[in-house]
């Protein structure tokens, strides 16, 4: 019931209920929340709290798949983009449970609800996909460029902007060609080729690379007149508005020590083990299984963990690939400062985090950290900087909520 950033959904079903594919099984908990839908048809066999990623308990609904894929009645808003009323698009996106398909999984309807006093001038589709191993959006751009363009146009129609940009790294020349063909002749749409580097796909870095505008400290993309969606995000919008389908599946890269690495169209909630089985199984017992890319992903406690809306990749790593070395003392080399795309001072932030001084860490701009992993990767002392910053950011957010 916590497939997204925001207040968890409330279960609407109980053990023994029969549900259809696409049926709402969780009610939204508020504005910054989303409904949850059944990704298979079948019988509900469990409604309980379970330990998930990062050893956090989350309310879950388990459905025994009857393999019938019995859909609910679908109600599209129109047959094409131009036939859809702009005012109906954002409510449809919210009802479909659409959120970012990576990163924080931020609810799309919130992102497209422009605050009073702000103005959106352009929507950017993030096709950079800069993290190693992850190729889900690349495959989607090759196989389904039309839906990405339709989703972008629907988002533009909902917000009332005339400029849409699809940004792709220059190492994906086939995707650039496919998207250029898809936008040909459509006013206001363009495809931009970006230098392939990490973390080019990070939201703030992407906006600067495409527009030259710098999102201010503690600011949001809308502060510089921009909204950013991913390719998968745009495709899901087209599915919801033009076909009436809620977000119940996504493309996920499965790679590492598996026999046949592949991009799979996977139902939300599918256990990692079943994705691996679909790829022929493991070539050897994995030392770690990571959800997400190698730089920003999270280790799973086991491969029985279900995939979520933000699961863009599953990587099975061998011991040689994943075993970490013991931390050494900081040698003040400054490499973390040079590597940080946000211009922060990671070594100094780590000192403050180790002291547990949340106020000082916040004053040192730890909240500006985009958790890209560059500082940890470059550190010769093998200091776990990124994970400490992520934990500190979470602690600061919890303290702020308690203070309210």
Each predicted region: which residue ranges?
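Short histidine-centered loop motifs in beta-beta connectors
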Residues: 9-18, 22
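Histidine-anchored nucleotide/phosphate-binding helix
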Residues: 142-157
